[in-house]
């Protein structure tokens, strides 16, 4: 299997540490006045999203992780797993609720998602940065009710709850940032 030397480290590189697939979040090369140079690296575990910091001596090598990212389309829920299909090969990937994580609240039929595979098995799903969803329930905004600028909670068609401005009504379609779970704008038809 391929390996990377410390001088090849950069953000986004996927490596295998203690049998766990990790992605390099941050890499800092340190050359102390005395002693050997080293790399201080922040790594994010792809299985559980934990971030750890490790140091590697200059010239040390790390095994490359067998991690693959595929663009897929969400098809349906199968009772105990979520089914995603590759749009060209029609290959289906069964994803557990555990691997789905926070992305579950943004799932919409026929939308595209990134499936992360480790050794051929799906380990996580990444939603698009922005999704358009319909508001199925929110309190009506009262005219002149502008004392609080925090907005009001709105339940979306996927079951997610986000805070929206007072002028947004039930039945409207809004754009939501999936990374922060925040309202971005109304979507014009």
Swiss-Prot record:
Major subcellular location class: cytoplasm
Subcellular location, record wording: Cytoplasm
Superkingdom of origin: Bacteria
Modified residues (N6-(3,6-diaminohexanoyl)-5-hydroxylysine): 34
GO MF assignments: translation elongation factor activity
UniProt keyword list: Cytoplasm, Elongation factor, Hydroxylation, Protein biosynthesis
Entry GO CC: cytoplasm
Family matches, as HAMAP family: EF_P
Protein name per the record: Elongation factor P
Species name: Francisella tularensis subsp. holarctica (strain LVS)
Encoding gene (name): efp
């Amino acid at each position: 299997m391929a390996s990377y030397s410390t001088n090849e480290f950069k953000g986004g590189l996927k490596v295998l540490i203690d049998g766990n697939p990790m992605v390099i979040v941050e890499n800092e090369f340190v050359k102390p006045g005395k002693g050997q140079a080293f790399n201080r690296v922040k790594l994010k575990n792809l299985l559980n999203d934990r971030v750890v910091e490790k140091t590697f001596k200059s010239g040390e090598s790390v095994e490359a992780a067998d991690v693959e990212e595929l663009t897929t389309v969400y098809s349906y829920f199968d009772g105990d797993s979520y089914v995603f299909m590759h749009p060209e090969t029609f290959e289906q990937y069964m994803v557990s609720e555990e691997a789905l994580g926070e992305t579950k609240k943004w799932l919409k039929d026929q939308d595209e998602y990134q499936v992360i595979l480790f050794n051929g098995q799906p380990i996580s799903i990444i939603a698009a940065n922005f999704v358009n969803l319909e508001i199925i329930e929110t309190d009506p905004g009262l005219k002149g009710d502008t004392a609080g600028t925090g907005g009001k909670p709105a339940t979306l068609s996927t079951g997610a709850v986000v805070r929206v401005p007072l002028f947004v009504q039930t039945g409207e379609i809004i754009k939501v940032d999936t990374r922060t779970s925040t309202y971005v704008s109304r979507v014009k038809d």
